[in-house]
């Protein structure tokens, strides 16, 4: 398995940023290396708070990297070269700009939209302290406070709120995402 970070792999359009078409262009090179599978690091729309792991839309290509047509052409070229395509799905969290998190912020505490994430009331007389002392992998508290006083969990950057895997909506959303990419030629 050959991991590719599309943003830095090969720039076809000359904008200084690697792109999906660049992966397609280098398919013969990958085949000649003996690669039998490529693993694409996140290439989804993102504000790049964490190198693309802060995903805004799991079912699209970041427009800076290309289009869905570019992705489909890349998957087809890979398969013609005998190379499988694996995409990096990030199921721990979304970006804070993901539609689900925006709905959660607009919703009341305890609502179904909030339940897609891990929201908690804070400690202290006025809830001014995080729910616990957990630390983010990036340093600092793993909790961020929102305008209504509740806190949400982010084990990574605060732009990456953790999803609640006890919520069936999250299961369904990621099943839809996996089906989507399977329908677009991915092998894993």
Residue ranges, per PLM feature:
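Receiver (REC) domain switch/active-site residues of two-component response regulators
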Residues: 187
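Acidic/aromatic-lined carbohydrate-recognition and catalytic surfaces
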Residues: 1-175, 179, 183
